[in-house]
C-alpha cells in the first residue's frame, strides 16, 4: 500500500489511489449474543472473498458459556459452503490469489497444528479435479493457544482463529493487543454495545451485524481506515 501511494505521488501531479494497508481484526462475542446472527456475520467477514481483504475478521474471542454453540453454528455454515469457480453462482468461495498464497495457507495450517491448535474445520489444500485449475483451499476455523504468533500476523487468507474467555475485560485486552487498529466487531446485548465502542481500539466498528462482523464499507465508495 505504501509503495503504491509513493508511486502515485512521485509524478508531476498527484493522482488519487486506493490502497490496502493491512489489518488483524478482532470480533468479541458475549454470552448475551444472538448466536445465529454472530455465526452469519463471522462467516461472511472471515471467509467472504477468501479472507483476502483488509477488513476481514481473523481473531474471534467468544465467551466460554456460548463457545461450543457458536463454533458449532459456524462449522455448520462452513459445511454448506460450495467451493469452486467463482464465476458460477452456486459457488460461494473461490480460489486464493496465487501460488504464494496457496503455499502460505499450507504453512500457516502447519504452524497452527505444531502449536497444538484444534482445527475444527478445514486445513486442506484442494488440488483434485477442477480444483487443479486454481489455488483452492478449505476455509479454516481453529481454536488456538493465546501465545500463538499468528494472533498478531495478518495472513490474508480464509483462516479464523478462536479463543474462549471468561471475563469481557480480558477479551478486550486480547482484542486490542495488536499493532493494527483497522476494524472490529461485536455481538452481545444492546446494553453492552457502548462498552465495546468505548474500549475497542479500531477506526471502524460494527455491532450485532449479520452481514459481516468486521466488514461493510466498499472501497472506492466508502473510504475507511484506522490506526494506532
Where are these regions (language model features)?
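ALDH superfamily catalytic-core signature
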Residues: 1-146, 168-169, 173-174, 207
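Conserved C-terminal structural/oligomerization subdomain of aldehyde/semialdehyde dehydrogenase
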Residues: 28, 82, 132-228
